[in-house]
């Protein structure tokens, strides 16, 4: 099972507040483990503009301010001081890796110089921090019904309102996740 470029959709049985009702985009998965970014947990009152100010990047007058007001997401509990930017492919930044034909991840701050300008990638999602699973850990969590998995969907990743992503991610595979009991078992 390779879950790279997939969503993990938290089952209602997950009680950990970090992952409760979460959707995680898996950007790396191998026999050694997996890494992903939560895509539906905004950081309260924290926007791309806050990051630009923190990095002391000058905001030009002709910048599209709507793009600067996009919320920054809590990507996970690890490296929470580091930016993880999912975006549509474009020219490469200092630290960019293509995940699929449609998605690139960048972890270098040079991408922020393009935000709100004509050089910005067409689609963009900014998160602080990431989530990580050790060798075999994610596979065990899937086997034990902690997650539903599905191929990543660009509409959900970039266009669906943040608070609707959990429900909508399950809906694309025909599941009304609100009707699943939090009590699970094996027969």
Curated annotation (Swiss-Prot):
Disulfide bonds: none annotated. InterPro entries: AlgH-like. It holds the Pfam family DUF179. PANTHER family: UNCHARACTERIZED PROTEIN YQGE (PTHR30327), UPF0301 PROTEIN YQGE (PTHR30327:SF1). NCBIfam families: PRK00228.1-1 (NF001266). Belongs to the UPF0301 (AlgH) family. This is UPF0301 protein WIGBR1650.
């Amino acid at each position: 099972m390779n879950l790279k470029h997939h969503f993990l959709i938290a089952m209602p049985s997950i009680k950990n507040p970090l992952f409760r009702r979460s959707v995680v985009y898996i950007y790396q998965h191998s026999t050694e483990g997996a890494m992903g970014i939560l895509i539906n947990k905004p950081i309260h009152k924290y926007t791309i503009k806050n990051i630009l100010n923190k990095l002391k990047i000058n905001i030009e007058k002709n910048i599209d301010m709507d793009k600067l007001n996009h919320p920054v997401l809590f990507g996970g509990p690890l490296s929470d001081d580091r930016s993880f930017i999912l975006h549509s492919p474009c020219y490469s930044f200092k630290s960019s890796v293509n995940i699929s034909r449609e998605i690139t991840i960048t972890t270098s701050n040079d991408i922020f110089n393009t935000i709100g300008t004509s050089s910005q990638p067409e689609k963009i999602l900014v998160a602080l921090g990431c989530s990580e699973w050790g060798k075999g850990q994610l596979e065990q969590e899937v086997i034990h019904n902690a997650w539903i998995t599905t191929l990543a969907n660009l509409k959900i990743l970039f266009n669906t309102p943040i608070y609707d992503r959990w429900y909508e991610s399950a809906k694309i595979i025909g599941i009304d996740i609100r009707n699943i009991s939090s009590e699970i078992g094996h027969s």
